Amino acid sequence: VTASSEDMKHSSDCYYDEYNLMDLRILSGVGFTDEDIDAIRNTEGVEGLFATHTIDAVTKIDGTQSTVRVMTVPDDNLTDDNKDYINRLRIKEGRLPEKEGECVIRYSEFYQEKIEIGDVITLSSGNDSDISDSLKTDEYEVVGIVYTPYYVSYDIGQSDVGNGSVGFCIMVTDSSFAREYYTEVFATVEGAKELDTYSDEYFDLVGETKERIEDAAEERLDARVQSVKDDIESERRKTIDEIYENVRTEVR
């Protein structure tokens, strides 16, 4: 049993390395700007970095509402030589999306019977917001079926839209998103691939880089908060100026 367990760990470690699985996933409640991304990229220990957009939406499959997680594929250089192509996809059937309005679906035995290449998935926000606030189009043609190392089990996770549980996952081009800020960042750590993913040495190495990123994030957070305050103040002044202008117009 012990030998079998070690073999499974070794196989999964090789799989993670082959498909460049992230070592760190970085989240922010206010999103990430290009300046934030540069700060993370320049942090000691960071090897590869992929800034991405992610949202949860709802759709109907065979008349039943389902929650779908929408993630992104890099727009270019999807090669094994690109260290920034993290969580690489393996194509089971079809091809990767090349333009807005195309997507691939993560392989799932359950949904594979319901969604096929050529089908069109129509998305809505599942709440009071408009899906166009996040995506440039609400319809996506399935052009491929893929495996991803990002999800190694059938459970994708929970969501605050739909029924609360994510049913399946699609990937679209990064340019399909309308949002200005990135929602999450994946990073790999220098020297991590040479270590066993399950070893203390691996966790120590990744932990050191994680702490340095957190320090850099604190500095960037202060700058972001000030930027948001400045934007709010600018809008406030603009509104006041418009009110005064309207008052003057009425007096005339």
What are these regions (language model features)?
Residues 2-3:
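A hydrophobic alpha-helix feature that marks transmembrane segments and, especially
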Residues 6-252:
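Basic-flanked hydrophobic alpha-helices used for secretion and membrane insertion
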